[in-house]
Amino acid sequence: MYLKHNTHERTSDYAEALAWIERVGYVVDGIVIDGMHTLFTLFEGYKVQMCQYHMCAIVRRKLTGNPRLPAGRELKALMASLTTSDRDCFTMAFEAWAIKWDSFLKERTVNPETGTTSYTHRRLRSAMASIRFYLPYLFTWLEVDGMPNTNNRLEGIFTDLKRNINNHSGMSRKSRERLINGFFLALGNNPQ
């Protein structure tokens, strides 16, 4: 098992981990990631799946849980269908939504103090831009046998670890690393 303690999530750490995984003889059929933009470039030679759960969470943060605009409510409903759609159906529905709301999304508001304009519905435009960026990676799991569409299983394994770290937030770095090492040692002896 590859294990490295990092204080920040960096692309170079992912590159190092992937190189180690391949060096010890594993073949990487595909990678599920949760949205770090630079990883798409780093893993360009691999089949990459954007975690559908994280995609929905990104859009939900931009729209809020209860969008007040009809365009936002429609986009929220479209995102709710993501995990049960295939690439063609979801893409067609998204493009139809974008065409329907195109002029609305281009509306601009004038700042009365400066006279400059900005997009009126910035958060909705941002949600749309995120979907456009990640769309090529949302259905890779259908092309790779056994690849999941989310990283929820892996996230679930780490729930206990995160809870323990949060419950002991005053731990020194060395103690935190010892806790993490013990977690992975136990996990390695009892794989899930």
Model-derived regions: residue spans:
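Acidic/histidine-rich catalytic cores and adjacent linkers
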Residues: Y26-F43, R73-Q192
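Ligand-binding grooves and catalytic loops that recognize ribose/phosphate and carbohydrate rings
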Residues: R68-G72
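An acidic- and aromatic-residue-enriched active-site/binding cleft used to recognize and process polar
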Residues: H5-H8, I33-T38, Y53-I58
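Inter-helix linker motif
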Residues: G45-P67
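Surface-exposed beta-strand edges and their flanking turn/coil or helix-capping segments
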Residues: Y14-L18, L63-N66, R173-R176
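Short, surface-exposed basic-aromatic patches at helix termini and helix-loop junctions that form
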Residues: A19-V24, F40-Y53
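Active-site beta-loop-alpha junctions of metal-dependent nucleic acid enzymes
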Residues: Y2-Y26, G30
